[in-house]
Amino acid sequence: MRRQLIVKFALVFMFLFGIQTAAAVEEDQPTIAKDSVQVTAFTFSVYRKNYDTWSWVPKIEYRVNGPIASGSRLYVEFTIPGSGPWVKFDCQTEATQKGFSWKTECGAREIPEDKGTTYAGPVNFAIRMRNELAGTDATLFTGKMKVAKVHSNEEGPKAANHFVYYVDHDWNLPIGYLFYEPEKQWDLDDPRRWAKPKFSFAFWTRGETSGFAEAHLFHGGKEVGKMYYEGKEMGAPSCGTTEVQHNTTQSTTPAGQFIWTRWKCTFTSVLPWNKTADKYETLFGRLYLFSENPGDYEIKVMHQGHLIRSLKFAVDAEGKLVDNGIATANKLGNDRVIVPVQVIGDQDGQWDRTAWKTDAFYGNPLKGFSVP
């Protein structure tokens, strides 16, 4: 009986140790930051030396979370369903320690023109990393994209097959991101970086946009984070930073419809917390702190007097964003919180409002995510 108990204990120990070891190994492997993967179609003004027909090749950029071992080489493979492998190319790679990341981009003109295709439809791809020193070849990310085409703005008989190709990114529109940003004048390991962080969020639009967005923050049904000087608002949120933009490489007819942009907005008068000796009072009023006002919040985004977006979130008593678990469950690969975005009005033109269900993150839809 005692021997049986010892054997059972040993088996349980080995099982638990195995789980911990596997988890530790997984943590020491490179991963892809999913929201950094951006794939576009690069249009060539030629197809198999025929300038009356245009073709395309892929361009991709992404960020890899370390460690990336010495001797590693990132590469990407694209496959057309029913036709097998299409193009494979290397991406610039550098050895990177754990806790740091490496951003790279590749494809486009690095691919020979004779590899261009006129195919439009679903395309599969895989981001891989080989290391001949270690004898390994691992898949880091697999995805699929929808490629479509639209006629260029050129006219005449020779322009009949001048099509411009693009990747459909409608799935992005209902997906938003909340995040805090450190004060970057301090070293990476200096705790002062996070003593007074900035509050930002990001969201997507489709189409050409000018004179862009105004962000408004609400808590308990009232707008907060406003400061004024002599009757004029000071320190209004800035939404002019473009994080990502997908645009066609040639002009199209119709124009301006095939542009997807991820904008970053930063609230300069709203802070998650303030652990510095700096005073909360400014010449224009008191800074608004999440740590003093926990609870539910809503961001409303206006454009030219019209409401175009709404997203909701919560903060705790320390001023931290309440994690809804979506980014963690889907292994986003960074510290951003994913939130659903309500798309309001016709600012973005016609778009596929259900694409997020199947196409999000290139065929890797979010678990636990729903759109209001």
Where are these regions (language model features)?
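Bacterial N-terminal signal peptides that target proteins for export
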Residues: M1-A10
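Contiguous segments within soluble domain cores/interaction surfaces
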Residues: V25-T139, H169-V301, R309-L311, A317, ...
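Extracellular interdomain linker/stem segments of modular secreted and single-pass surface proteins
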Residues: K146-E154, D316-V322
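Acidic, serine/threonine- and glycine-rich low-complexity intrinsically disordered segments
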Residues: A148-V164, W171, F179
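Sec/Tat signal peptide C-region and signal peptidase I cleavage site
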Residues: I19-A24
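Short, structured interface segments
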Residues: A138-V147
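Bacterial N-terminal signal peptides
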Residues: F9-G18
